[in-house]
Amino acid sequence: MTKQPSLRVNAAALAAGAILLAAGACQKPQYSEGLYAEVATNKGLVVLSLEFEKTPMTAANFVGLAEGTVENAAFPLGRPYFDGVEWHRVVPGHVIQCGIPKSETAKDPGFQFPNEIVLPDLNHGRAGMVNMANGGPHTNGSQWCITLGDRSYLDGDYTVFGQVVEGMDIVMSIAQGDVVQTVKIIRVGKKAKAFKPTTESFKAMVEEAKVRVDQAEADKKAKEEDLVKANWPDAVEGEGGVKYATLKTGQGKPPLPGGTVKAAYSGRAPLAGKSFVSTSEGGKPYWGETPAPFDFIVGTTKVNPAVDASLASMKKGEKRLLIVPAAQGYKTSGFYATQRPGEKRFVISPNTFLVYEIETLDVRPPATK
C-alpha cells in the first residue's frame, strides 16, 4: 500500500500557501506570517515556505548560504551562494536538484551537518516538498531538491525543511541545465524577522545536533549488540566485524578464483523487523535480481562485501549464518531498488545491519577457454 502524505504537512502547506496576490501585475505578492524563499529561475518564480521552527538548523544553513551570512568554502561572506546554480539533476517523477555553487574555489560549502528528521509532520508524501540531498546519513551540505511526486520511501533518510507554495508549474517545467538566478529570503512576522543565521549561531546548532546523533548511534549500536547476543550467542567474529555461525558443514574445497558457486540465500534487517529476500520463496518479499538459486562467479559477481567473501570461502553443501555490520553491507548509501508501478519502493536504509543465511548448493571450477 502506498503511504499517504501526512495531513499535518498538507495543512501546513495550505496555511503557508495563503499568498495573497495584490491587485495589479506590478505589485509584489504579500505573505502570511512565516519564512519564505523566492527562487527566481530562468523559467519563472518558485516560492518556498521554510520550516524554520521545526528544522531550525537546516533552515539556517539554507538561509545563511542564500544571504551570504554563513562562512563557506565557495564564496566570501556577503556573497549569495545559490545565485547562478544550475538544476544539475532532473529525474522525471522523482526530484529536481541543485546547490553546486558557481565557484572556482569549491563545489560545496566545505562543511557537513546532521539530518534533522521531523516525522510525520515533514515527509516526502507529495510533490513540492523541499529536502536536502546527501551522500549518506548526516552529510548534508548545500545541495537541495524539490520532489515531483510521492517519494515516501525517502522518509527518515533525508531532511524535509520546506514546501513549494507558489510556482509548482514552474518546478514541473524545470529541465537539466536550467538556472537559479537569485534566491531572496522573505521574513513576515516577529519570529521570522528574528531568524537571522550567522556562522556562530549555525555552528552552535550543528554541534548540538552532533551530540544528539552520537547518542542515537551509541544507543543503536547497543541495541544491535543486545539483539545479536540474545539470538546468536555462538556466532564467531571474523574479518571486518562480520560474525558467522556454521549451520551445516560442507565437503570438498572452496571455489577457485573465477569458479562458480550455485548459491541460495535469505536476508533480513532485524532492527527493522523485516525480511527482504529469500531464494527459497522465489525472491519474496522483494522480487530482486536473484529470485531463485543463482550462479555466483568468484571475483566477478557482487552482492555485498560480506556475502561475496563468504561465498568465496564456502564448500559445497555448506550453510552459514552471517551477521553483517553496515560497513560490510550497504554502508552509508543503503539500497534503493528499482520502483515498480503500483508498489511501494523497496529500501534498505543506510547504516543497517543485516542477517543472511547462505547455502552453497554446488561448486564448479573456472570455465576453460
Regions found by a protein language model. Give the residues of each.
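Cross-family detector of peptidyl-prolyl cis-trans isomerase
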Residues: 24-369
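Basic/polar N-terminal segments that are highly enriched at the extreme N-terminus
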Residues: 1-5, 22-29
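Bacterial N-terminal signal peptides that target proteins for export
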Residues: 2-14
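Generic secretory/membrane-interface signal
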Residues: 4, 18-19, 61, 65
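Bacterial N-terminal signal peptides
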Residues: 13-22
